[in-house]
Regions:
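Hydrophobic targeting segments
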Residues: 16-22, 37, 49-52, 70
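Short beta-strand-to-loop acidic/aromatic patch adjacent to the donor-nucleotide binding site
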Residues: 79-99
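Short, well-formed alpha-helical segments that are part of the catalytic scaffolds
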Residues: 27-41
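Short, conserved alpha-helix that lines the donor NDP-sugar binding/gating region
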Residues: 63-75, 163
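A recurrent flexible, glycine/aromatic-enriched loop bordering the glycosyltransferase active site
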Residues: 120-137, 144
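C-terminal catalytic/acceptor-binding lobe
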Residues: 151-154, 160-268
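Conserved donor-nucleotide/metal-binding helix-loop-beta segment in metal-dependent transferases, i.e.
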Residues: 81, 99-126
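Juxtamembrane luminal stem/stalk of type II transmembrane Golgi/ER carbohydrate-processing enzymes
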Residues: 1-17, 33, 248-268
Length: 268
């Protein structure tokens, strides 16, 4: 599609640089993530920087809006020349608890391609999701589909909404090789509790998820209409204070504290 055509070409002649964006909320810790992922990226020769988007308000967690917040903060900082970050040619939207299975020697060949520059379609590193867990895509394509929707509060469906946008572009994500065996998911305790709570009778989280499922079904036919008015361009949360820079497994992690209180229709 013409609106997505620019996302299929290279941005520059330099080796591509990856921004790893990790949406989270305290007290979640990045200790294990930093111990495991950065050494893998260095061994693979991937130029990268890691960013955490930390939700600091009391609203339900909003993974998609947090990624939009980080992407916008990076773009704004680069335009204002507030940091010496390079242009990030591609992005890995990365769950905190999912990693390549380096201990499995038979996975070495598959893992080599996981975080490489996705010149064509995005790459998803989750065996049971169309766009969740870990999604690697070009920055230009993320902008072309207007990023994530901002309206999926709590658990679920923001990744499927993004899939509809990418499919509309003609670039639905493809699964990485052998991700069922070669990506490890160490589900956090809070995540397991949240998933259990979804099934409880009268659960607010469960009711919210059912509302998300209805919204998603309503968007299937015309994702373009919705993505123009809900996404990166309409994000109106805020970064609270300056970013924090900390060591992360031999790399650096930059944390943006994000308040989503300004988003229209927050937590509906």
């Amino acid at each position: 599609r013409p609106a997505c055509a620019a996302a299929g070409t290279a941005d520059n002649d330099e080796p591509p640089t990856l921004a790893v964006v990790v949406p989270l909320r305290a007290p979640a810790t990045v200790a294990e993530f930093c111990a495991r992922l950065p050494p893998i990226l260095r061994r693979l020769g991937v130029r990268h920087h890691i960013f955490a988007a930390n939700q600091v308000d009391a609203l339900p967690f909003n993974r998609g809006a947090l990624v939009n917040a980080a992407f916008k903060a990076l773009s704004d900082a680069r335009r204002a020349r507030r940091h010496d970050w390079p242009r990030f040619d591609y992005v890995a939207v990365h769950d905190l608890d999912r990693f390549p299975a380096e201990a499995n020697a038979s996975c070495a060949a598959s893992i080599r391609g996981y975080y490489s520059f996705p010149a064509g379609a995005p790459r998803v590193l989750h065996p049971n999701s169309f766009a969740g867990g870990v999604l690697v895509l070009r920055s230009a394509l993320y902008r072309a589909v207007n990023g994530f929707s901002n309206v999926y509060w709590g658990y679920g469906e923001e990744d499927n909404d993004l899939f509809l946008r990418l499919r509309w572009c003609g670039l639905p994500p493809r699964h990485g090789d052998a991700v069922d065996a070669c990506m490890v998911h160490d589900d956090c305790a809070a995540c397991r509790k949240q998933k259990r709570d979804l099934d409880k009778k009268g659960s607010a989280d469960g009711a919210r998820l059912r509302g998300h499922e209805e919204r998603l079904r309503a968007r299937i036919a015309q994702p373009r209409r919705h993505m123009l008015h809900d996404g990166l361009s309409t994000f109106n949360g805020s970064v609270v204070g300056p970013p924090r820079h900390e060591p992360c497994g031999g790399s650096t992690i930059t944390t943006f504290d994000i308040s989503l209180a300004g988003i229209a229709g927050a937590a509906t």
